[in-house]
């Protein structure tokens, strides 16, 4: 009987820290939806991100707090709508950011 070594492709990939994941997602969300960089916000400091994570604050709540505090306007909403468009980040926005940064793998073909 021949035996083959077990290979696990994920074992070779380093696991990102929660702070690194937040940095990637914040960078994408802020740039795409508000035209900001991470350095334009308090989240340029890793300690601030860690404090939010430790306090159990979600990424969406953290971004939406900035939106409310600084009255940010989304730059990705174009055109006229009969409904007022929300300036806030949604779960769908975060999922799209996860996919575009490679943090969410989909097997849909």
From Swiss-Prot:
Encoded in prophage CP4-57. Toxic component of a type IV toxin-antitoxin (TA) system. Acts as a dual toxin inhibitor that blocks cell division and cell elongation in genetically separable interactions with FtsZ and MreB. Overexpression results in inhibition of growth in liquid cultures. Overexpression leads to formation of lemon-shaped cells; inactivated by overexpression of cognate antitoxin YfjZ but not when the 2 genes are coexpressed from the same plasmid. Also neutralized by overexpression of non-cognate antitoxins YafW and CbeA. This is Toxin YpjF. Disruption phenotype: Single deletion leads to an approximately 100-fold reduction in resistance to oxidative stress, deletion of 3 type IV toxin genes (cbtA, ykfI, ypfJ) leads to a slight reduction in resistance to oxidative stress, has no effect on cell growth. Induction: Expressed in mid-log phase at lower levels than toxin relE. The keyword Membrane does not apply. It comes from the Bacteria. InterPro entries: CbtA_toxin. It comes from Escherichia coli (strain K12). Keywords: Toxin-antitoxin system. Interacts with FtsZ but not MreB. Another group finds interaction with FtsZ and MreB.
């Amino acid at each position: 009987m021949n035996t083959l070594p077990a290979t696990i492709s994920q074992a070779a990939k380093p696991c990102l820290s929660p702070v690194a994941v937040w940095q990637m997602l914040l960078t994408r969300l802020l740039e795409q939806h508000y035209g900001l960089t991470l350095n334009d916000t308090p989240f340029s400091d890793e300690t601030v991100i860690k404090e939010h994570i430790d306090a159990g604050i979600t990424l969406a709540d953290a971004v939406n707090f900035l939106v409310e505090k600084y009255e940010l306007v989304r730059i990705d909403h174009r055109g006229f709508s009969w409904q007022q468009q929300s300036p806030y980040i949604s779960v769908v926005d975060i999922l799209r950011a996860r996919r575009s940064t490679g943090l969410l793998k989909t097997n849909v073909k």
